[in-house]
């Protein structure tokens, strides 16, 4: 087919391939990532962002207010910038103070609202909030770049491009809370507002606005230091400065705890890939667009500098694979004479590339086809919970387990390495944590995310029960299996609902789960700091607050260092 708008003739990649930690840990952003979808909506609906208040002193401490006007509603980001003693600065969840804290407010706050939030927002988890607050966040300055940028601007010059590119952001968030936490509005209160109806749009809006605040903050500090000489950031430089994020175990269980939602995410992406691979004629303009993006991606990957040896080695491999892609897709290449060219390219890459190279190709293939890909993002949310069918018999349920959870049944839990860890919820930090099962206390608080282990126990219990017995009778007697019985029914209906790996084994790297989720957010330049946490960049290259009406507002993926003249700004 010339335009892959119907059912793709190329099959979707199997869940047994896609839903493995190794592949999830090699994910990249795509056109259906949440940040990309937000920017497109902001552009399409002509959103307006105004800075209504910027009461910061010469040291950059005080309050700022940004108001976003959509066709239907207004939202406000209230920013509180604080002095932070150096010894208190940490990205870890144990922190109790930050360089800046933020609240996303439903509407435009009055003086009383701002006064109340000035008291509560800096407390973060210890604060108390109302339904008028949608998102709570905080951020710290990047010690490698923040002061350097201020120093350069104060002297009337642009920041050093290589120092800037090594980091890619001025500040990084260390938490973004929403969905009813600490008294804030539950997501169901604002899903009728089209601007925030899709998953994580309130959080993505908050992070985007924080990025703009960081730009304004460094320019303000430079102007305070030397009003006569201070420069402002050149637009290409400002666009290249995204917002960082430090993410740990807190978000990892989400992918396991929301099987139906996760199916929707991965199924949408895999449907998009199958549609692109099914295209029979790749027109010259689409070929040219792909080559342009490929060249951009090579520059972007070359600037992906991290301290993690494993990721550095993978990045070097990626650069070699991108050079091969460039050769394979050169103008006049025989690949475009294949019956289904993109499928031929993907199959060639699948046999020759690393998993990370394959997943980067998936991201690249999406870009020339907004008409095919972008609407798939409408299927990312869950509109209603899947009902549980208690009338199934034990025999029928055993068949579901064997048909859809063979990966779980294949794990040998007599090997102690397969149950090395347990996950639990820390009441002190209101965050998930991971402990060594045989060395640390708290196993009795284990979260129900050890899907493979639970499925095996469920399967054994079913095998000891009369096959004609219904789930109603079975679960009345064995209530400890209720959660997994429901899960198996969901997994049988939704093929991408499960991470098909053992998340409590000694080989599980939680950062693979994190990257799988963060790629759907729109993150780039993953910078693993251990197996348990990573830093990322969001919105690098994205249009600025006053550029959302640009014709190419969505053409910002794979950003690379802009050319910066080493001269003073006028």
PLM segments and residue spans:
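Mixed-charge, Lys/Arg-enriched low-complexity segments
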Residues: 2-20, 97-172, 202-388, 405, ...
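Amphipathic alpha-helical segments
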Residues: 24-51
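Acidic, low-complexity, intrinsically disordered interaction modules
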Residues: 196, 200, 204, 208-220, ...
């Amino acid at each position: 087919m010339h335009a892959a708008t119907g059912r793709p003739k190329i099959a979707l990649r199997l869940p047994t391939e896609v839903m493995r930690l190794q592949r999830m840990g090699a994910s990249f952003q795509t056109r259906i990532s949440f940040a990309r979808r937000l920017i497109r909506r902001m552009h399409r609906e002509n959103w307006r962002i105004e800075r209504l208040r910027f009461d910061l002193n010469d040291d950059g401490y005080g309050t700022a207010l940004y108001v976003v006007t959509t066709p239907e509603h207004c939202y406000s980001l209230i920013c509180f910038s604080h002095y932070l003693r150096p010894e208190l600065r940490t990205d870890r969840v144990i922190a109790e103070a930050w360089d800046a804290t933020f609240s996303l407010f439903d509407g435009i706050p009055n003086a009383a609202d701002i006064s109340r939030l000035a008291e509560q927002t800096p407390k973060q988890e210890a604060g108390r909030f109302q339904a008028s607050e949608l998102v709570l966040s905080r951020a710290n300055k990047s010690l490698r770049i923040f002061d350097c940028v201020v120093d350069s601007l104060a002297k009337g010059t642009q920041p050093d491009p290589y120092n800037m590119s090594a980091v890619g952001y001025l500040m990084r968030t260390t938490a973004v809370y929403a969905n009813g936490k600490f008294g804030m509005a539950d997501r169901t209160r604002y899903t009728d507002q089209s601007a925030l109806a899709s998953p994580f749009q309130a959080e993505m809006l908050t992070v985007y606005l924080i990025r703009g605040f960081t730009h304004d903050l460094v320019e303000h500090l430079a102007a305070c230091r030397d009003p006569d000489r201070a420069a402002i950031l050149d637009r290409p430089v400002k666009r290249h400065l995204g917002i960082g994020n430090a993410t740990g175990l807190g978000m990892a269980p989400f992918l396991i705890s929301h099987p139906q939602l996760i199916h929707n995410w991965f199924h949408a992406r895999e449907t998009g890939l199958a549609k692109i691979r099914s295209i029979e004629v790749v027109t010259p303009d689409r070929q040219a667009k792909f080559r342009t993006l490929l060249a951009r991606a090579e520059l972007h990957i070359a600037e992906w500098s991290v301290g993690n040896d494993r990721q550095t080695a993978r990045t070097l491999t990626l650069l070699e694979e991108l050079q091969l892609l460039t050769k394979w897709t050169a103008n006049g290449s025989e690949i475009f004479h294949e019956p289904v060219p993109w499928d031929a390219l993907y199959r060639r890459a699948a046999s020759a590339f690393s998993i990370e190279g394959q997943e980067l190709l998936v991201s690249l293939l999406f870009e020339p086809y907004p008409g095919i890909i972008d609407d798939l993002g409408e299927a990312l949310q869950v509109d209603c919970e899947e009902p549980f069918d208690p009338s199934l018999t034990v025999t029928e349920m055993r068949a579901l387990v064997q048909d859809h959870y063979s990966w779980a049944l294949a794990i040998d839990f007599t090997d102690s390495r397969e149950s090395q860890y347990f996950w639990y919820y820390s009441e002190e930090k209101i965050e998930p944590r991971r402990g060594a099962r045989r060395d640390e206390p708290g196993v009795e608080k284990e979260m129900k995310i050890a899907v493979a282990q639970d499925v095996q126990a469920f399967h054994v219990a079913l095998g000891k029960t009369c096959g004609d017995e219904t789930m109603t009778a079975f679960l009345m007697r064995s209530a400890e299996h209720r959660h997994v019985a429901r899960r198996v029914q969901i997994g049988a209906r939704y093929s991408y609902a499960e991470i098909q790996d053992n998340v409590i084994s000694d080989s599980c790297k939680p950062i693979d789960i994190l990257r799988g989720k963060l790629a759907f957010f729109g993150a780039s330049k993953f910078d693993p700091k251990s197996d348990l946490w990573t830093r990322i960049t969001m919105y690098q290259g994205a249009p600025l607050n006053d550029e959302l009406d640009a014709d190419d507002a969505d053409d910002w993926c794979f950003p690379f260092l802009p050319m910066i003249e080493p001269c003073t700004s006028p």
